[in-house]
């Protein structure tokens, strides 16, 4: 008959006499104790008892430059104090010191890990208070070789929060109490923020005794160690320092004794046998994947296997009776009831007499298979057909499966149902679990896709590639040739262009339109709508037999602009073009950086000399701009201001290198009179390099060029329409010649032209002997073409060629092939119009909020000022007066996109400051709106320069 501890009456645990405990070294030493057995009186149980506490090691978090000198202080009921020796300069201290203390069943153990210092008070590295009653309840009053892994916490002085600082390993030993005779005081809640513990069934003792780590309550893990006659109780374990995330990172560097390996490995193989020893019943534990089974060998009797065990360790002998499949312990040893395994052990052709006594199996092994036991008593299966071994019992292959061998003789399995292969032998249970997981995964993915997109009425299951039906055809008409409409599993419609093998969300029939065709008015008489192969809409005028992309209906919208400042119809392609260009720039970037030191007074000359003396490829490195006399650090803001100021200088018409297009157009073009400067070609080469650097590094210039100039950069053919933007009078003259019969007018036009540069008349022949050939009605088209080409290039051929050479040295002109002239202007100059609503929507605040009065006054000031002052304010904060093509949401900082920021800094007497590298405005807490306007206006108009804060 067994008592409450699961031991036979009159027998001591592990074959030792009552009153003996095992110390940390594993040797038996007679230690007097009042808890000598389960038969102790109730009064003795309620009195003081001896407990052996071994402080083994700790793993502390690495959070400083200097390593600590840790030691452990143990307090029992806040009275009795014990200390370990200190370990110098270590985050992984090991003490292995044992203390014998007097405790009651309701005692508290307070573990403190402190950092010793000779010059200051010892600092707390972590602490934890443990209520012994919780452990006794969990382990049915037994603390024998009980390893505790305790999470240590430290309290922050700033916010009084507790954070994990490490782990401590301690061993409790030598305590056995009868829980039925104890009076455990109820605990309202665990200290240090731990939740109250719940009563645990005493049957869990067997689980812990098997060596498994068992969570008692939050942050305290416990397990019963197996007894050892040699070696330290920690089993040669080593610890690595805790990472920031905490957690236990333990690994064994020394193999445990044979009897411990037998105990642990038998758990990993899900062996349906219960091993019973003196410390409790061992329950097998399932491992996800066992080790590779040993090669086939002669099975040894179990008595031979356990013959080498030490005398003080009870072997986990196994008896297989002929009448049942359950394993029982040796005579005289009691244990928990053993469940009958689901499948019996099959009888094989083994010569081992122990295996011959096993019961017959309901499902015999397949032909050529054999069951054996290894030296640790673990079952494995031998396949003599393939000369391989397995831990798992072989079962017939599921329907549709086949076993094969590859060229190297390795066995694999073929699933003809799904046309897949696997190295793992399939069974029905594993396939069922996999199919269940697939179904759950598909359901979760479907629910996640439909959560925020559509209503319940629209969430109907649809095939991923469902074809469009007749019901889907609406008033928009059929899709263009080569297009197809499909539907996703979440009912979202997309369109496939089979000609270029692309997909898109937009309907090609309505792409780029502000409203649908249903709401648009009728076309004028003789007009028709058609679509190109790419799905782009155009209009056919049958009256004049012409086509156009512009809607002829009066008041028809030309298409709303997207976030990139281009029509929405082209926004998708422009975004792709821009990403392709940025990819080319990044993939050809060079490491390190180049320094360019300039002064504000001689900005043009300093920049010219430093850029021209460098090889062109060096200009692709990251720029580090330094203004002499200013201590600013260039994280992007200084270089933005350098590009802004230098572009204002080099494109200044006062230098006679460029000129305005006309009186009403302030776009720039090359000045034909630039030859008055003898070094003008070198300057144009420098400007070409500079403009290419702006494109390459993603910076904006102050002002842009004419559209014909951008077309020359893109190597596009110029037309008569391009003259209209730079010389409207000349354009009107050519149009008159084109539309009228010049033979009747007698204009006396010849294929030659004269023009004046700086008072000098220059004669130019449009073609050979052009001054002798008259323009007639028959050859006037040739005349208009030659005249257009001459007007766009007159006097600037060499300058344009040199400019493009300098540009091509830094950025190959082939990289610009993605863009048209308007897109090139957009990425070079940005957007000049400032959208205040977009600005305010993409602004963040620090120590302010959107309702702070200073913030409200700031936006009032922005709205009341004109565009020029807004641009000055933007240039003051960001380094440039232009807005990126994506709006204020794409303002760039030092490490990528960084939004406009307003931060509360300083006193009301201070001027506003800016951090151009981070797009941040330091706005002091002014007391009135007038004061804010005065200080802000003075800052953006009267100040310049950088400094370090």
UniProtKB/Swiss-Prot annotation:
Ranges for domain C2: 30-146
Biased composition (Polar residues): 347-359
A GO molecular-function descriptor: Notch binding
PROSITE patterns, A to Z: C2, HECT, WW_DOMAIN_1, WW_DOMAIN_2
Keyword Transferase: yes
Coiled coil: none
Keyword Transferase attributed: yes
CDD domains referenced in this protein's UniProt entry, alphabetically: C2_E3_ubiquitin_ligase, HECTc, WW
Known catalytic reactions: S-ubiquitinyl-[E2 ubiquitin-conjugating enzyme]-L-cysteine + [acceptor protein]-L-lysine = [E2 ubiquitin-conjugating enzyme]-L-cysteine + N(6)-ubiquitinyl-[acceptor protein]-L-lysine
Key words of the record: Developmental protein, Notch signaling pathway, Repeat, Transferase, Ubl conjugation pathway
Active-site residues per Swiss-Prot or TrEMBL entry: 917 (glycyl thioester intermediate)
Name of the protein in its database record: E3 ubiquitin-protein ligase Su(dx)
UniProt source species: Drosophila melanogaster (Fruit fly)
């Amino acid at each position: 008959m067994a008592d409450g501890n699961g031991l036979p009456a009159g027998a001591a645990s592990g074959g030792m006499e009552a009153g003996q405990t095992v110390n940390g070294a594993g040797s038996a030493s007679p230690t007097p104790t009042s808890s000598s057995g389960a038969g102790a009186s109730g009064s003795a149980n309620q009195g003081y008892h001896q407990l052996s506490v071994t402080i083994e090691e700790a793993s502390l978090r690495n959070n400083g430059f200097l390593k600590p000198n840790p030691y452990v202080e143990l307090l029992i009921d806040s009275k009795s104090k014990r200390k370990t020796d200190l370990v110098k300069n270590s985050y992984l201290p090991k003490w292995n010191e044992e203390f014998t203390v007097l405790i009651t069943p309701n005692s508290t153990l307070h573990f403190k890990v402190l950092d010793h210092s000779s010059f200051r008070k010892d600092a707390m590295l972590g602490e934890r208070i443990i209520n012994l009653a919780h452990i006794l309840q969990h382990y049915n009053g037994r603390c024998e070789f009980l390893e505790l892994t305790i999470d240590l916490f430290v309290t922050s002085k700033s916010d009084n929060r507790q954070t994990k600082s490490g782990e401590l390993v301690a061993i409790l030993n030598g305590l056995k109490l009868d829980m039925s005779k104890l009076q455990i005081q109820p605990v309202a809640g665990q200290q240090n923020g731990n939740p109250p513990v719940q009563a645990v069934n005493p049957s869990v003792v067997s689980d812990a005794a098997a060596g498994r780590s068992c969570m008692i309550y939050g942050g305290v893990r416990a397990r019963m160690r197996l007894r050892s006659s040699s070696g330290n109780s920690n089993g040669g374990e080593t610890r690595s320092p805790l990472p920031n995330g905490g957690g236990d990172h333990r690994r064994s560097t020394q193999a445990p004794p044979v009897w411990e390996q037998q105990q642990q490995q038998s758990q990993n193989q899900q062996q349906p046998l219960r091993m019973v020893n003196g410390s409790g019943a061992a329950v097998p534990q399932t491992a996800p994947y066992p080790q590779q089974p040993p090669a086939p060998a002669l099975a040894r009797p179990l008595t031979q296997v356990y013959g080498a065990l030490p005398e003080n360790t009870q072997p986990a002998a196994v008896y297989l009776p002929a009448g049942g499949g359950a394993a029982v312990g040796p005579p005289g040893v009691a244990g928990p009831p053993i469940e009958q395994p689901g499948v019996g052990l099959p009888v094989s052709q083994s010569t081992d007499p122990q295996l011959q006594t096993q019961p017959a199996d309901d499902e015999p092994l397949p032909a050529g298979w054999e069951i054996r036991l290894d030296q640790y008593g673990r079952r494995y299966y031998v396949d003599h057909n393939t000369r391989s071994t397995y831990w798992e019992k072989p079962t017939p292959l599921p329907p549709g499966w086949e076993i094969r061998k590859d060229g190297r003789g390795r066995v694999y399995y073929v699933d003809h149902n799904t046309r897949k292969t696997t190295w793992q032998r399939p069974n029905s249970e594993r396939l069922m679990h996999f199919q269940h997981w697939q179904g759950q995964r598909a359901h979760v993915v479907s629910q996640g896709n439909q959560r925020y997109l559509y209503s319940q009425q629209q969430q109907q299951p649809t095939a991923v590639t469902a074809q469009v039906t007749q019901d889907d055809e609406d008033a928009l008409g059929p899709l263009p040739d080569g297009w197809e409409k499909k539907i996703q599993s979440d009912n979202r419609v997309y369109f496939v262009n089979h000609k270029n093998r692309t997909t898109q969300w937009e309907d090609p029939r309505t792409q780029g339109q502000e409203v649908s065709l249903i709401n648009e008015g009728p076309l004028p008489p003789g007009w028709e709508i058609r679509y190109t192969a790419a799905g782009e809409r155009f209009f056919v005028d049958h009256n004049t037999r012409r086509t156009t992309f512009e809607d002829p209906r009066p008041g028809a919208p030309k298409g709303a602009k997207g976030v990139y400042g281009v029509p929405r119809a082209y926004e998708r392609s422009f975004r792709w073009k821009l990403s392709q260009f940025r990819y080319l720039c990044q993939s050809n970037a060079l490491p390190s950086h180049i320094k360019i030191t300039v002064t504000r007074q001689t900005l043009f000359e300093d920049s010219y000399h430093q850029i021209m003396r460098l090889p062109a490829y060096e200009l692709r490195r990251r720029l580090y701009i330094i203004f002499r006399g200013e201590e600013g650090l260039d994280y992007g803001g200084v270089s933005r201001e350098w590009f802004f100021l230098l572009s204002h200088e080099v494109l200044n018409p006062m230098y006679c290198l460029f000129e305005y297009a006309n009186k009403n157009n302030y776009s720039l073009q090359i000045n034909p009179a630039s030859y008055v400067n003898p070094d003008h070609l070198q300057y144009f080469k420098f400007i070409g390099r500079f403009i290419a650097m702006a494109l390459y590094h993603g910076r904006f210039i102050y002002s842009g060029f004419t559209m014909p100039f951008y077309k020359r950069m893109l190597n596009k053919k110029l037309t008569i329409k391009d003259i209209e933007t730079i010389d409207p009078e000349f354009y009107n003259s050519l149009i008159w010649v084109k539309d009228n019969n010049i033979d009747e007018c007698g204009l006396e036009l010849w294929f030659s032209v004269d023009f004046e540069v700086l008072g000098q008349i220059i004669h130019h022949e449009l073609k050979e002997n052009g001054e002798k050939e008259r323009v007639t009605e028959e050859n006037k088209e040739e005349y208009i073409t030659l005249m257009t080409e001459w007007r766009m290039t007159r006097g600037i051929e060499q300058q344009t060629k040199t400019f493009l050479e300098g540009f091509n040295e830094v950025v190959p002109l082939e990289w610009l092939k993605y863009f048209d002239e308007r897109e090139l202007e957009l990425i070079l100059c940005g957007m000049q119009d400032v959208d205040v609503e977009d600005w305010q929507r993409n602004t963040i605040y620090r120590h302010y909020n959107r309702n702070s009065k200073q913030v409200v006054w700031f936006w009032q000031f922005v709205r009341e000022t004109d565009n020029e002052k807004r641009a000055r304010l933007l240039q003051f904060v960001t380094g440039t007066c232009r807005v990126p093509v994506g709006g204020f949401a794409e303002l760039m900082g030092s490490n990528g996109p960084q939004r406009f920021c307003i931060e509360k800094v300083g006193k009301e007497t201070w001027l506003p400051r800016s951090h151009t590298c981070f797009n941040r405005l330091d706005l002091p807490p002014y007391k009135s709106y007038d004061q804010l306007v005065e200080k802000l206006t003075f800052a953006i108009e009267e100040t310049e320069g950088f400094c370090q804060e």
